A protein has these predicted regions:
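Short phosphate-binding/catalytic loops that engage adenosine nucleotides
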Residues: 48, 80, 136, 221, ...
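Short loop/edge segments at beta-strand edges and connector loops
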Residues: 13-15, 84-86, 92, 140, ...
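Flexible, glycine-rich terminal cap/loop adjacent to redox cofactors
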Residues: 185, 202-212, 217-282
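Rossmann-like dinucleotide-binding cores of NAD(P)H-dependent redox enzymes
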Residues: 18-19, 24-28, 34-109, 166-174, ...
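Glycine/Thr-rich phosphate-binding loops of Rossmann-like dinucleotide-binding domains
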Residues: 1-2, 37-38, 126-128, 167, ...
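Short hydrophobic core segments
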Residues: 1, 29-30, 50, 111-121, ...
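FAD-site-proximal beta/loop scaffold in flavoenzymes
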Residues: 7-24, 110-183
């Protein structure tokens, strides 16, 4: 990432964090997205003092904002410090650890920890394959444009996964590959992204499928939101003592499900059912 001083410190990527053999006493995570929050959850459970620095005004950008705030509150109770709407301006190595200098509405500040995890996203590899020799149409974010069959602007060239930049999820790439093979072999099929679930494996889990309230509001689509506390489930209460959980369903005026978002440890299992309802038009 283009942060002054980052090239001079031995920071972690998510792969480094997984390969690490020792538990640090403290950890700063730059980036409060999916990967950042999953590692924050993991290291907090090991007793590590974690600080999350996020440029946006809420963690988990792209997920339901209300539920993301609820998850953040749960982890604040567990001791994670969050610095939101905060820009990292410099990284340096000192005798007491790695120091991250930042700026936000409260002014300038620093946070020092034993380890630094950079979780600000990854870029797909686009060089070294000869792609520059093809007359491919690219997006502004250097991803390859595709149609509903995953075919690029060059007939016979199909692009699945992160390189098309639509949905950076492994299960999405599997479905995209299926659609591409069907098109190549003459079977009727087309890619739809409206009901692809996403899960953040924190504790509690948070999951979503379909449109969020923010997306519906931005698109000017009328909807109603129905929220049901997970506390209505005896199993949830038994397994998640003291934890807030909620299931939020977003529906059109005729009752068609447009999106569903859940906070609570059954979320990764239940979200698939919500996706089925969206795909079926119920």
């Amino acid at each position: 990432p283009p942060i002054p001083g980052v090239e001079n410190v031995d920071y972690w990527t998510h792969r480094d964090a997984l390969d690490n053999k020792e538990v640090p006493a403290s950890l700063t995570i730059v980036g409060g997205g999916v990967i950042g929050m999953e590692f924050a959850s993991f290291f907090t459970s090991l007793g590590v003092q974690v600080t999350v620095v996020e440029m946006l005004d809420e963690i988990l950008g792209g997920m339901d904002k209300e539920l993301s705030a609820m998850l953040r509150a749960e982890y604040a109770k567990k001791g994670i410090k969050f610095l939101l709407s905060t820009k990292v301006v410099e990284v340096s190595k000192g005798e007491t650890g790695i120091t991250v200098s930042y700026e936000n509405a409260d002014g300038a500040g620093t946070v020092t920890a034993d380890k630094l995890l950079m979780s600000v996203g990854r870029r797909p590899v686009t060089k070294g394959f000869g792609l520059e020799n093809l007359n491919l149409e690219w997006t502004e974010r250097r991803c390859i444009k595709v149609d509903e069959h995953l075919q690029s602007s060059v007939p016979g060239v199909y692009v699945c996964g992160d390189l098309n930049g639509v949905s950076l999820l492994a299960h999405t790439a599997v479905r995209e590959a299926e659609v591409a093979v069907h098109h190549i072999t003459g079977k009727e099929d087309a890619m739809s992204y409206r009901a692809i679930p996403g899960v953040v494996y924190t504790n509690p889990e948070i999951a979503g499928v379909g449109m969020s309230e923010e997306a519906l509001q931005a698109a000017g689509i009328p909807y109603r939101a129905v929220k049901l506390p997970m506390a209505y489930s005896g199993r949830f209460v038994a397994e998640n003592e003291g934890v807030n959980g909620v299931c939020k369903v977003l529906a059109a005026e005729d009752g068609t499900v447009l999106g569903a978002h859940m906070l609570g440890n059954p979320a990764s299992e239940l979200i698939v059912l919500a996706g089925m309802a969206i795909e079926d038009g119920k």
